Amino acid sequence: MFMQTKHIAQATVKVLQSYLTYQAVLRIQSELGETNPPQAIWLNQYLASHSIQNGETFLTELLDENKELVLRILAVREDIAESVLDFLPGMTRNSLAESNIAHRRHLLERLTRTVAEVDNFPSETSNGESNNNDSPPS
């Protein structure tokens, strides 16, 4: 169980690290659009031909092309991480709890509706007549 939990945590860190890299690139891309349009154009072209899905691979490949930009991405990524990581544990727990409650409520509503529909469905007796217990016997 511990190894599985550790593996999940490591995979989560990798995804989060890539996402922070992506957010840093977006921030820099926006800044460059205002301060250095030629560099912004270069970055846009680079992004069009290189996947940022894996942040670490992206940075390794970019290192061969533009070391300054990599250093800037690293600094911005670290800054973003510093500003959000303290909030993540509590926000994640709360968000998951709220999501789970909403999904359980939706499931319960569906089950209740299904049971109500089954209860309202007219049953038939063995001779093909509707079984109506509300009418008086003849």
From Swiss-Prot:
Gene3D superfamilies: Chaperonin-like RbcX (1.10.1200.210). Residues 122-138 have a biased composition (Polar residues). InterPro entries: Chaperonin_RbcX_sf, Chaperonin_RcbX, RbcX. GO terms for biological process: carbon fixation; photosynthesis; ribulose bisphosphate carboxylase complex assembly. GO terms for molecular function: protein folding chaperone. It is found in: Carboxysome; Cytoplasm. It comes from the Bacteria. GO terms for cellular component: carboxysome; cytoplasm. Residues 118-138 are annotated as: Disordered. The keyword Chaperone applies. Keywords: Bacterial microcompartment, Carbon dioxide fixation, Carboxysome, Chaperone, Cytoplasm, Photosynthesis. Its main location: other. Homodimer. Interacts with the exposed C-terminal peptide of RbcL via its central cleft, contacts a second RbcL monomer via its peripheral polar surface. Belongs to the RbcX family. An RbcL-specific chaperone. The central cleft of the RbcX homodimer (RbcX2) binds the C-terminus of an RbcL monomer, stabilizing the C-terminus and probably preventing its reassociation with chaperonin GroEL-ES. At the same time the peripheral region of RbcX2 binds a second RbcL monomer, bridging the RbcL homodimers in the correct orientation. The RbcX2(2)-bound RbcL dimers then assemble into the RbcL8 core (RbcL8-(RbcX2)8). RbcS binding triggers the release of RbcX2. PANTHER family: CHAPERONIN-LIKE RBCX PROTEIN 1, CHLOROPLASTIC, RUBISCO CHAPERONE RBCX. The homodimer has 2 functional domains, a central cleft essential for production of soluble RbcL in which the RbcL peptide binds, and a polar surface which plays a role in correct RbcL subunit arrangement. This is RuBisCO chaperone RbcX.
